[in-house]
Regions:
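Extended, small-residue-rich solenoid/repeat segments and analogous flexible loops
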Residues: 1-36
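Flexible, glycine/small-residue-enriched loop-and-beta-strand segment within the central core
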Residues: 26, 36, 43-137, 174-175
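Short clusters of hydrophobic/aromatic residues that line enzyme substrate/ligand-binding pockets
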Residues: 31, 95, 171
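Beta-rich strand-turn-strand
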Residues: 117, 132-145, 151-154
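Short, intrinsically disordered, charge-balanced linker/junction segments flanking boundaries
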Residues: 169-177
């Protein structure tokens, strides 16, 4: 009888020679970031070894940011996927899109407020995210959804939807009515 590996084991795949496949990780064991929550058995893969999975997947999410990233149980994340969290955005309502506020500690609180307004990014359980996809800030991806390779997800994805494209659109549902 096959057993599930320990969800806290960093490298869950064992190669035929007995060595761990270092390019696939259970994220719960690989990410230590105060703004990222990961469910059991969620995994990610890469084409080369990754030292900092939090920075790889969510490069703009800094500790203390007002937003968070939640990745559900059994989520599957392919190489090159990025979560573009709210801290990556630039102001667009003024004369310049340059983020002056991030360089002035006295103004940082205003920037944090703008980021918080976009909300958290939530990936439901059993979601499969294809190679190179981008998931933008504040998006919720429903349980069992599939995101196609290189898709740019700018809106919420319903449970069990298959989405593709830029911007991502529902191309079908995994299960019929």
């Amino acid at each position: 009888m096959q057993r599930f590996p320990d969800p806290l084991r960093r490298h869950p795949v064992t190669l035929p020679d007995g060595s761990p496949h270092r390019l696939t990780v259970f994220l719960k064991a690989a990410i230590d970031h105060p703004n990222i929550e990961v469910g059991d058995y969620a995994y990610a893969s890469a084409f080369e070894e990754v030292e900092d999975w939090a920075a790889c997947l969510a490069p703009y999410l800094y500790p203390g940011a007002p937003e968070r990233l939640a990745i559900g149980r059994f989520a599957q994340i392919a190489a090159g996927v990025r979560f573009i969290t709210a801290s990556a955005y630039h102001p667009m309502g003024g004369v310049s899109a340059f983020p002056f506020r991030i360089f002035d500690p006295a103004q940082m609180q205003h920037y944090r407020g703008e980021c918080a307004a976009r909300g958290d990014t939530v990936i439901g359980p059993d979601v499969w995210i294809g190679h190179g996809a981008r998931v933008m800030a504040g998006v919720t991806v429903g349980a069992g959804a599939i995101i196609g390779a290189e898709a740019v997800v700018t809106r919420d994805v319903p449970p069990y939807a298959v989405v593709a494209g830029n911007p991502a659109r529902v191309v079908r549902m995994r299960f019929g009515p």
